[in-house]
Each structure stands twice: as structure tokens, then as C-alpha cells.
């Protein structure tokens, strides 16, 4: 079984998907982290961001695997480093690159196929999982929250990692990101017509997970 969770940036997809997978005994596939990993490697290798092909070469060469909810690049656990503000700022160079998108989608499908072949169901999250990557998924969820709620969560998330970011600037970035994600030609943010729409404002993570478990089990 494949469960897709799509939604805008800062909606809590990663946290919810991880906990939903744990609650159901499924494997978790963090597709967003895969694009972040490409950007992370680009920063580490001082790539010229004005040359898209340079980043494509990195994406082609890097070995990505997902294990127990963690993301590894060339056997290095990068699950935490890829969440930094610096990586967040550069991730769009990977996510908006058609060639990199094609590489990552292919790898996501391969990972899902391998896990399903072993009898393991997965929870996968991103921007277009239920539309472009896994259009035939058995259960699709669109998870969202207001921009203000998402900005507050993002500021708190960075604070917990010892990083300080401005709320107003974060809110502006989220609004810009939403518009950009919906308008981009490659992998645009789009709610699957057959997805269950869930707004999480005012809800705890536990409440959201409980609601999604109920949706999956119905």
C-alpha cells in the first residue's frame, strides 16, 4: 500500500508522515529530503548555482537511500543537516530543475517498488506525490494550514535547532514559496482531486496523526 501526503511548505508533512508511518507500521519516504540532499551536496561542493547542469551531475552521481525514516547520501546520514536554513534557501534549485526532478521521481518509484516487493507499505510526502509520482496510490491526503500558522511553526522549528529567523520574513517567504510552487512548470504543488483535504490549524501533531489514521482505516 502507498499513502501519499501532499501539501504546501511548512504544513508539517514530514513530522506527520513519520508519525503516521510509525502508527501504522509502514515505512516512511521523505521525498522532500531527497531534493534537500541534492542542494546540501551542492553547497558542500561549492557548486555554481547559475549552472543547472552542475547540480544535475551531482544528483546523478550521489547515492541516496532511505532507511528507518532517515536519509543517507553516500552512506552519510544527512537527515538533520538538510533541514538547515542554508539548505532550505537553495533547495528550489534542485526541485525546480526538470532533469533532477526526473532523476528523483525515478528513484522514489524504485524505492517504493522495492519496499512493496518486500511486503512493506509506505507513507510518502511531498508536493506532487499523489498527482505525478504515485497517481495510483491507494490513499491520498492533502495536508495544509494557513500561511500564518505555517510561519509560526517554521520559526519554532528553527529555534529548536538553535537558529533564529524573523517571523515576518518567514511569512513572506512562505507566501512567495506557495505562489512559486503552484506556478512552476515542473512538479507543481497541486491537490489530487481524489485526496482527503485536512486543515491542521490549531491541531496538535497527535490530533492530526489520529485523524489520518482514521482516514486510512476507513
Spans of features found by a protein language model:
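Anionic, Ser/Thr-rich low-complexity intrinsically disordered regions
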Residues: 126-135, 141-152, 161-186, 206-207, ...
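Conserved lysine of the Walker
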Residues: 13
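Hydrophobic anchor at the beta1->P-loop junction of P-loop NTPases
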Residues: 3-5
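N-terminal phosphate/diphosphate-binding loop that engages ATP/GTP or pyrophosphate donors
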Residues: 22-85
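NTP-dependent small-molecule kinase module
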Residues: 73, 77-81, 89, 155-163, ...
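The conserved Walker
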Residues: 9
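Hydrophobic positions on the alpha1 helix immediately C-terminal to the Walker A/P-loop
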Residues: 16
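ATP-dependent NMP and nucleoside kinases share a basic, alpha-helical "lid"
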Residues: 79-82, 86-160
Amino acid at each position: 500500500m502507498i499513502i501519499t501526503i501532499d501539501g504546501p511548505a511548512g504544513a508539517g508533512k514530514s513530522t506527520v508522515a513519520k508519525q503516521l508511518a510509525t502508527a501504522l507500521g509502514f515505512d516512511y519516504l521523505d521525498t522532500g529530503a531527497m531534493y534537500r540532499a541534492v542542494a546540501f551536496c551542492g553547497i558542500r561542493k561549492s557548486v555554481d548555482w547559475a549552472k543547472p547542469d552542475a547540480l544535475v551531475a551531482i544528483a546523478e552521481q550521489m547515492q541516496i537511500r532511505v532507511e528507518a525514516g532517515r536519509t543517507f547520501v553516500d552512506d552519510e546520514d544527512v537527515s538533520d543537516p538538510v533541514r538547515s536554513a542554508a539548505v532550505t534557501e537553495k533547495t528550489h534549485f534542485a526541485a525546480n530543475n526538470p532533469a533532477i526532478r526526473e532523476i528523483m521521481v525515478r528513484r522514489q518509484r524504485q524505492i517504493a517498488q522495492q519496499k512493496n516487493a518486500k511486503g512493506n507499505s509506505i507513507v510518502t510526502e511531498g508536493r506532487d506525490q499523489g498527482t505525478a509520482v504515485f497517481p495510483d496510490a491507494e490513499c491520498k491526503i492533502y495536508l495544509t494550514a494557513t500561511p500564518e500558522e505555517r510561519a509560526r511553526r517554521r520559526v519554532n522549528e528553527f529555534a529548536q535547532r538553535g537558529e533564529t529567523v524573523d517571523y515576518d520574513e518567514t511569512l513572506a517567504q512562505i507566501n512567495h514559496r506557495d505562489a512559486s510552487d503552484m506556478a512552476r512548470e515542473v512538479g507543481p504543488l497541486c491537490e489530487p482531486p481524489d485526496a482527503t483535504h485536512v486543515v491542521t490549524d490549531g491541531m496538535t501533531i497527535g490530533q492530526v496523526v489520529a485523524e489520518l489514521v482514521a482516514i486510512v482505516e476507513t
